[in-house]
């Protein structure tokens, strides 16, 4: 995969970052999928706290979200650019766990959280109009290794979705139009509030949608 090739590329050209070594900069390599990069992002804030220059070689869809949440750290577009920029070390993102997550207290000490785009959030809330409680729902992952444990048919949530005192927001990525339309016909109304956000590619928009929710079911 691209992520494995990147790790192999940088391991031949840069030293592996370690807190006991005096590096002046480090390139953080995203690994696995975008969901894992989001899950491990709080580790980057711990790395930044060590006062080292941090560059990010991660999924470009996260640039806006991470720039707002972590500060404007450099996003690197390709391997050669990282070498030209003179980074002195590299580390795969999840490998930061062994330095910054060794006890429950380490999790409690970290105060990192994602910041949604306020402009997008304001437009969404204006567009949604209703004052009903808003519940965001996602129900499917494309993960081959964990999909069977984490997926559910949308129809299994019909007891919840039939409640007309709640507004539902679609947080699901991918093409699930047929499934949504089938259930909408059964309930004789649109299940989800309308918006134009691409949940797979517009991560800033998706983050704003989550922020607009009172509750999220995932």
Q: What is each stretch, according to the model?
A:
Residues 1-218:
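Catalytic machinery of carbohydrate-active enzymes
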């Amino acid at each position: 995969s691209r992520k494995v090739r990147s790790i192999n590329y940088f391991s031949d050209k840069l030293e592996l970052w370690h807190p006991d070594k005096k590096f002046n900069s480090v390139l953080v390599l995203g690994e696995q999928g975008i969901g894992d990069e989001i899950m491990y992002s709080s580790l980057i804030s711990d790395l930044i706290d060590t006062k080292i220059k941090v560059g990010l070689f991660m999924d470009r869809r996260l640039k806006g979200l991470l720039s707002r949440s972590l500060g404007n750290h450099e996003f690197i577009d390709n391997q050669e650019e990282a070498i030209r920029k003179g980074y002195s070390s590299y580390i795969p993102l999840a490998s930061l766990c062994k330095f910054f997550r060794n006890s429950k207290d380490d999790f409690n000490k970290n105060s990192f959280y994602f910041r949604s785009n306020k402009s997008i959030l304001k437009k969404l809330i204006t567009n949604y109009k209703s004052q009903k409680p808003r519940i965001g729902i996602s129900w499917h992952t494309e993960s081959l290794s964990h999909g069977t444990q984490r997926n559910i048919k949308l129809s299994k949530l019909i007891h919840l979705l039939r409640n007309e005192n709640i507004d539902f927001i679609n947080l699901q990525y991918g093409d699930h139009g047929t499934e949504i339309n089938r259930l909408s016909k059964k309930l004789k109304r649109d299940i989800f509030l309308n918006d134009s956000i691409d949940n797979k590619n517009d991560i800033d928009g998706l983050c704003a949608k989550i922020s607009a929710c009172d509750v999220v079911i995932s």
